Every structure is written in structure tokens, then in C-alpha cells.
Amino acid sequence: MRTLAVYIGMTFLPRFVMLSRSRKFGRYREARRANWAFGTIQSSIALLVLLSLVHSSRAVAANPDLETMLTRSRQRIEKLDYRMTGRLTRVEGDGKRTSYKFVAKAHWFSDGLRLLCEISGPGSEKTSLLLRMSVTGQVAIETAHPGEKTASVLPFERWNNPLVGTDFSYEDMVEDQFFWKNQELLAPEKYGARDCFVLKSRPGSQDRTHYDSVTSWIDRGILFPVHVVKTLRGTEPQKEFIYYGLRQVGGVWSATQVEAKLQGKSGSSILVIEAGSGKANLGRKDFDISQFNTQEEKGK
């Protein structure tokens, strides 16, 4: 506030001096008008900035629940340090199941999150996926698909492609929506028996995503999402995520099962966590996707 007040004062002061001199020297009338117009524009801009900051501070003050939710959600992600194994299963409308072994590890470093997933198909083929998310929520994805000896950057236009034929996409593997610029607290709702905050997250111009918005139903007691709806850009259908088996280990809440459903499409996909550790003490060397692929080649 002080900086803006000083800026406004410095904007008006030269205008006052010039106007006083213009009265004494009439031949500078045109210069006086130009300076007055320029000064008016500057002061108007400064006033608009001031009003916008006041409005923003009032909005934050009026939504302490919003600030608490965002802080807790981000802190939960910033404390990640786990290894886990489980199954990723696509369930067709007729009940037919296709299951994949799912192995993942994640750790938050000083420059952000790293998540490495290894998905084994019904045969011996494996897909590797390395996601990086910066401290501001910017995402980068590398993949190594069956038959590829080296990993490569996944083009943005493929981020929302199905992951090994399931309803999960590549970008669904991280919760970057909590780091997006635009966050709105909607009216509270019940989801089943749970009282929930409802948070609507929208990406800013700098956020790379195929989603137009993500709406999260967050349990008021544990501040963990129990239901999420992602709206794709354009005319694409919505995608729904349901979290089951919520548990607290070492003070950290997590889900043991996540189900993904695509609106208008029969069946669903289920990610089940079967075992793991929430304190894996991982380092950067544990997220070398090229090293993983080299080890796989040696093991054949």
C-alpha cells in the first residue's frame, strides 16, 4: 500500500509543478495540456492497481476456507515421498477386465515434484512415465513405450490420451490443479455422508492442460478430495474421479483406490494401491527414467 501511495504522489507532484510554471509562461500552454493528459492517465492506472489489490486482499480475507484448503492441499503434495505397487484395471461395460501391474514412486524436491510410473501389460511389455511438476505447478512429461529404447518428451497434444487404454490420461497422474492461478470456493455440498468444501480450479494462461476446469469435493474434516470432476476444453465429455478407502498414515491422508469414469462411455478404470511406503527417502537418482530402461534391457 505504501509503495502505491508513493507512486501516486510522485505521479501528481510533477504535474503540479508543470501547471504552476505554465500559468507564468503562457507560451507553454500546449505542453501543459499534454502533460496534464499524460498525468491523468498515469494516476488513473495507479488508482486501478490500488483498487484491484484492495479487492484481492478483501477476497482472501473473506475466504479463509479457500486459503486453508489451498495451503493444506499444496502442503500434502509438497510432502510426498512414497513408493507403491498396485493394479490399474480397465473394466468394460460387459464386465470384462484388463489389468496392468502399476508401480510408482514420487518425491517433492526443492524444485518441485517428480513422479515415475512403471506399467506392465498383460504380456511383458512395459510403459514408463516420468512427470515433473515445478513449485508453481508447471508440468513436463517424458515417456518410454514398449519397443522404445530411450525416453522422449511427450508432446502436449498427447497429454490427455488414454494411459494404456484406460480412462486415466497422462496428465491425470498429478494434481496440478491446486497450483493453478484461478481458484473459486463454491457453496458447500454433501458427497455421500461427507460434508465437503467445493473448490473450482481454472488454469491460467501459463498453465498447460487440456482441462477447462477441475471441481473438487474436499472433505471438511480431513481436507482430502473424495470426488473430482474434470471438464475438458471444447465439446469433450467430463471425467469423474471417485476416491475410496481413505486412510491416514503418519499424519498424511491418502486413498487406497481411485476410480475414473468418462461421461457417456460405458465402464470405468480403477487404480488400486496394494502396498507401499509413505517414507521412502527417495533421491534424484531414483527418477532417472533412462537408467530404468537400461536396467530393463539388461534384465531381458
Model feature map: region roles:
Residues 105-107, 184-190, 244-246:
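Short amphipathic beta-strand and strand-loop transition segments with alternating hydrophobic
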Residues 42-54:
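Bacterial N-terminal signal peptides
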Residues 64-147, 184:
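N-terminal mature ectodomain segment of secretory-pathway/periplasmic proteins
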Residues 150-152, 161-163, 168-176, 190-290:
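Gly/Pro-enriched, hydrophobic low-complexity segments
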Residues 1-37:
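N-terminal secretory signal peptides that target proteins for export/translocation
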Residues 177-181:
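Surface-exposed beta-loop interaction hotspot
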Residues 59-62:
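Boundary at the C-terminal end of the N-terminal hydrophobic targeting segment
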Residues 287-299:
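Short, low-complexity, Pro/Ser/Thr/Gly-rich segments in the mature regions of secreted, periplasmic
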